């Protein structure tokens, strides 16, 4: 039952506390009391008033303090707002009253319905009346100006509270919608199935929907940011509605699934990544981590410069790879611990230390060398045989004076050896570039695992990098230091000696590759090409286009040989022999590859033959018919070539296979062979005649479709000075580790199902090629 306002008595007890609420309370707390509770409160209050009526009026407590507290407290304004009265009805000041005499009871009056309606109507027009308007309104309604002032003040507080409640409700609703939508996308990714066979979708196949998922993810992030900004305005601090994913492919689908950077040459960062994919989510919180990163980088730079300049006893000389090779330096762990007690701290349990140093004079200026090292794309291209993926996660400093002096950036890099039997090494580090006081330049890497710990640490970079000294005539002297701690227990036995010696990932391989690539880049810019040699390409534009096409071929080959997860290959289980790894990918809308299903088969094995002899045999077109099944026994001729450096084995060639069958058309093969102190490569791909004519005339090579195949030849370990050893696997054997890899188009329809017959054919092809090579080089190695 509702009680008219005029019959509702005051609800102030003897202690001045309010038992009930005025009509204004219903504005801010409409559901505070239900009907039954209201009746009980009213009956209880009637009993209180019966007792109060027996007390003289002078003993009633004054409400002066309560009025002031209600007026000054916005939260308590709701209770006061419906009460009115004068603060001292007798006109006697508080100081003049007898302290022994109880104060008279304060008389309060409810605002009438008419007064409330008039003030609410005025509030709609003007929520902030001035003194003149309040006085005029109080005169019209028969109220004190102070009563009008407090009513408007409390009314504004109520409206603000209502608005905030509405906004909070809307934010909660939007938040729940986004959360549900985000969960739907996660479930869709986790339960995706192959449209052909109904089985789980292969990692590479997820790229078909990746573009749409990226767009949707960006939209969701914008919506989250908008809502968080609104919430922060009312709550007073930023809100994070959703937890941030922190483990990329560590759980098989852990790298920020939708918002990923793109690797060089258009290869997208893997959606589900591999062991180190989580680095992408370990972005630097600049304000918090930057001072620590800077301090770590400066200390690492100091350590690198000293390690590059000091000799014995810090560095000792190891036996050379052969009689013509330079001596290789290794680090003394005891001296290192004594000279650099700080650094990254003690070696992690289960990790093996690996350190090496090498130097060379290369044909490139210091400025160009620094630019290559500080640009992730150029870095991955120049060292494509060592770096399978390089991503700059965050640039903390771009340097000063228009160069890279002082540049600081956080990177994630995956290092590789060209074999499926050697796991890649993933590292998360800061790269720092500095010009020293003596004019030399230094670029140093040091792991950030101390700031961003990884649950599974398999590769930790202690200060590593290079010191670059400018030389006359555009040359530079480069001193390279590699110092890492690794878990290499997964390396196959035939590669353990190579890896443990530091030849697989060490400084000699970096310096050898850099020297060879500098010569290659110099040949691109060469202008004094002799025209007397037969088959030499003299056109400047033709040379550039052909070398660019060959570079793409080499990068594609290296990306399909190793166990890297950065190139969207899907390994097939149960594909045949255990020593052959078969992978597949779908090629769609890629002008550099033929459309369809591509199979990649790779295997590695040991040969009791020196690496140079294997390299010369495989690159020689006259002996190609002994191992190349696809040439069908035809005669192979070199039509054109481009020399790439001092060693005649470094060149790009265009070969023609003259088929012995008159019904078959002749085939062109693009081949690049390269060699240095750390290893050799022979990589080739069939090419279209019309497309190659365009390239030789300086046309764009990016639209030439090719699938590379070839060989990577590495020594089986450090050899004793001067000889090939006894032919057995071990230190000083002088044998070779040969990796054979084929990329073959098995179906021109990308949506077709992969047949087991195609896999068997590729396995048979690679097995037959391996047997032919073994037979041929073994026959050559026998003394005549």
Curated annotation (Swiss-Prot):
It comes from the Eukaryota. Residues 286-523 form the START domain. Residues 102-113 have a biased composition (Basic residues). Residues 158-234 form a coiled coil. It is found in: Nucleus. SMART domains: HOX (SM00389), START (SM00234). GO terms for cellular component: nucleus. GO terms for molecular function: DNA binding; DNA-binding transcription factor activity, RNA polymerase II-specific; lipid binding. CDD domains: homeodomain (cd00086), START_ArGLABRA2_like (cd08875). Keywords: Coiled coil, DNA-binding, Homeobox, Nucleus, Transcription, Transcription regulation. The keyword Glycosyltransferase does not apply. Residues 60-113 are annotated as: Disordered. Residues 104-163 bind DNA. Probable transcription factor. Belongs to the HD-ZIP homeobox family. Class IV subfamily. This is Homeobox-leucine zipper protein ROC2. It comes from Oryza sativa subsp. japonica. The gene is ROC2.
